[in-house]
Amino acid sequence: MNIYCMRHGRTNYNDLCLCNDDPAQDVHLTDVGIKQAQSAALALRDIEFERMIVSPLPRTYQTAEIVNQYHSIPIEVHADLADIRSGFDGKPVSDYFAAISHDPLKARVNGGESLLDHKQRVLRFIDWLKVQKDKALLVVAHEETLRVLIAHFEGGVADAQLRDIHVGNCEYRHYVLHR
């Protein structure tokens, strides 16, 4: 199976450097994010995707809808693709990182999940992918989620190095999943 993993377009919360893991918050693509998604859509227009799988957060769906203008295929939400539940929704990203600095892999704050909790959730999504019959899928998710996918597909990344992986807005990578 060909899997294209893409991060959502730039959002108002990216501009404000705020955490978001609540689908009810008004987090949306900015004009820059829309242009990024349009550019990615153009680059991916000839790929014969059968489905697009997105996280429950609206910015991923909004990005997928723009890419889907060339495909007109189902867009499905998968809960395991959600961004890390930081416990800092609407608060500065820097505050979140300060709060977990004592144990970046295992720290859980404000009822959120740890990086390792999040990793397990994303690995569960990969197990789900392995039983799908599609030939080509587009997965639209978040940088934190994509770090786990990249580490899995490319290998050689220790848990402590996950956050060293950078994925720009609307950056995508192609992988082949052998079942």
Show where each model-derived region lies.
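Short beta-strand scaffold positions
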Residues: 54-55, 120, 140-141
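Extreme N-terminal starter segment of soluble prokaryotic enzymes
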Residues: 1-4
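Glycine-rich phosphate-binding loop signature in dinucleotide/nucleotide-binding domains
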Residues: 45-48, 129-136
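Phosphate-handling substructures
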Residues: 27-28, 69-123
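Domain-level recognition of soluble alpha/beta enzyme cores
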Residues: 156-179
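Short, conserved phosphate/pyrophosphate- and ester-handling motifs at nucleotide-, phospho-/glycolipid
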Residues: 8, 142
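Active-site-proximal alpha-helix that buttresses catalytic centers in soluble enzyme cores
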Residues: 9-71
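GST superfamily/GST-like fold recognition
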Residues: 143-147, 171
